[in-house]
Regions:
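Phosphate/NTP-binding elements of NTP-utilizing enzymes
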Residues: 2-246
Length: 246
């Protein structure tokens, strides 16, 4: 990756030079109209922060290991939209820093994403949760899908379970999707839905969590419980995604 100057960063506008380079080098053309109305500045000027393109490659590989389950694309690999790479996957997973033990970890621990309807929210969520559970280098990872009700939890869980169940790569890796959880028996890594604080209190130590459709959550108790539970993990990620026009 080429060296980046402060003036480069100032001219980059919607994308950091690092992410812009990543998209160009991987063939993603990001239309101007997809630029978010608001976004958190990336940590390019922060001491110790650096961009690791290989980490973004791994997330995208996890997405491509999943399969469409409906319509004309059924059975074909998922593919991220350029805007998903530029404004979500590359910034969240590409920026890293060394922790107190000298280990390289993600810069971001929390993400809030708002997108209009019919813009691949389910696909994006599925890819990130599968990556966190089974490809992030975290043995025995617990990934929880938080929802405001059991019905909403199923809406978050079922598309991920279907995409995993249709994936030959997931099957080869020993990952199985069941009615109430997706699990890798070799180390107990798991994805499962939760719909109340009580669901999260017994033996949970989440490496990541998804809060889908945040606007339907009655309160923040469940999310706060999940945030507290991530304390023992080296690089947890809380991912909140909701419909922008809801």
């Amino acid at each position: 990756m080429p060296a980046v100057t402060t003036s480069d960063r100032a001219r980059a506008h919607g994308l950091s030079p690092e992410v812009r380079w990543y998209c160009e080098s991987r063939g993603y053309e990001v239309p101007e109209w997809t630029k978010p109305l608001w976004r958190t500045p990336e940590p390019g000027e922060e001491q110790g922060a650096r961009f690791d393109p290989a980490r973004v490659d791994r997330v995208i590989a996890a997405l491509r290991a999943l399969r469409h389950t409906q319509g004309e694309w059924a059975g074909k690999p998922l593919e991220p939209s350029p805007w998903q790479v530029a404004y979500v996957l590359a910034p969240i997973f590409g920026w890293v820093i060394e922790d107190a033990d000298g280990k390289t970890v993600r810069w971001y621990r929390d993400a809030w994403v708002e997108v209009p309807r019919k813009n691949g929210k389910t696909t994006l969520s599925a890819a990130i949760m599968v990556y966190l559970a089974f490809a992030d280098g975290e043995g025995g990872a617990q990934v929880l899908l938080a929802a405001g009700s059991k019905d909403q939890a199923r809406l978050a869980y079922d598309p991920i379970a279907l995409a995993v169940g249709a994936s030959p790569q997931m099957a080869d890796a020993g990952v199985r999707a069941w009615k109430s959880k997706i699990i890798r028996a070799a180390d107990g890594a798991v994805i499962k839905p939760v719909a109340s604080v009580g669901d999260t209190l017994q033996g949970t130590n989440p490496h990541g969590y998804l809060a889908d459709e945040m606007h339907v959550h009655k309160d923040l108790d469940l999310i706060q419980s999940l945030e507290t539970g991530t304390g023992a993990r080296r690089q947890p990620l809380g991912f909140v995604i909701t419909t922008a026009d809801a």
